[in-house]
Amino acid sequence: MSTPPLAPTGMASGPFGGPQAQQAAREVNTATLCRIGQETVQDIVYRTMEIFQLLRNMQLPNGVTYHTGTYQDRLTKLQDHLRQLSILFRKLRLVYDKCNENCGGMDPIPVEQLIPYVDEDGSKNDDRAGPPRFASEERREIVEVNKKLKQKNQQLKQIMDQLRNLIWDINAMLAMRN
């Protein structure tokens, strides 16, 4: 799944781009393309916000006290931003087309098949029925052990009460003797 090299932002391909750099640029996977696309979208949003900021601050030259030099500067900035915005959209389109080309062989799975339904009959539910049964058996065993523990605790409490009563009786007889 190798793709043709994309020129990274701010880097010019010149005499310093050796064969190792070209090889690394050719091996761009789909995840890297998606990251580049995300960064491009962020740049587009940033440029668009700057364009709206310029348009908001820019007044039309209708004879109102407005300097033509300032107007020309802002107009130049606006045209530059629009030119860069069109370049970014072309770059985004290239990234989008390349991602679709790389993922073209994959068959998309409909979302409805990815969502498990309770009343769905099939082998998928049979596979999933194993662990809940095991959990219910384990739960039943825990309940039984708890019942046995409560019974043992009750028996120990009765024995302790009997010993307490015996000690009281012994102490009472010793007290009467003296």
UniProtKB/Swiss-Prot annotation:
It is found in: Nucleus. Residues 134-173 form a coiled coil. The modification N-acetylserine is found at residue 2. Pfam families: Med30. Keywords: Acetylation, Activator, Coiled coil, Nucleus, Transcription, Transcription regulation. It comes from the Eukaryota. GO terms for cellular component: core mediator complex; mediator complex; nucleoplasm; nucleus; ubiquitin ligase complex. The keyword Aminoacyl-tRNA synthetase does not apply. GO terms for molecular function: nuclear thyroid hormone receptor binding; transcription coactivator activity; ubiquitin protein ligase activity. Residues 1-22 are annotated as: Disordered. One of its GO terms (biological process) is protein ubiquitination. Signal peptide: none annotated. Component of the Mediator complex, a coactivator involved in the regulated transcription of nearly all RNA polymerase II-dependent genes. Mediator functions as a bridge to convey information from gene-specific regulatory proteins to the basal RNA polymerase II transcription machinery. Mediator is recruited to promoters by direct interactions with regulatory proteins and serves as a scaffold for the assembly of a functional preinitiation complex with RNA polymerase II and the general transcription factors. PANTHER family: MEDIATOR OF RNA POLYMERASE II TRANSCRIPTION SUBUNIT 30 (PTHR31705:SF4). Belongs to the Mediator complex subunit 30 family. Component of the Mediator complex, which is composed of MED1, MED4, MED6, MED7, MED8, MED9, MED10, MED11, MED12, MED13, MED13L, MED14, MED15, MED16, MED17, MED18, MED19, MED20, MED21, MED22, MED23, MED24, MED25, MED26, MED27, MED29, MED30, MED31, CCNC, CDK8 and CDC2L6/CDK11. The MED12, MED13, CCNC and CDK8 subunits form a distinct module termed the CDK8 module. Mediator containing the CDK8 module is less active than Mediator lacking this module in supporting transcriptional activation. This is Mediator of RNA polymerase II transcription subunit 30. It comes from Mus musculus. The lineage of its organism: Eukaryota, Metazoa, Chordata, Craniata, Vertebrata. The gene is Med30.
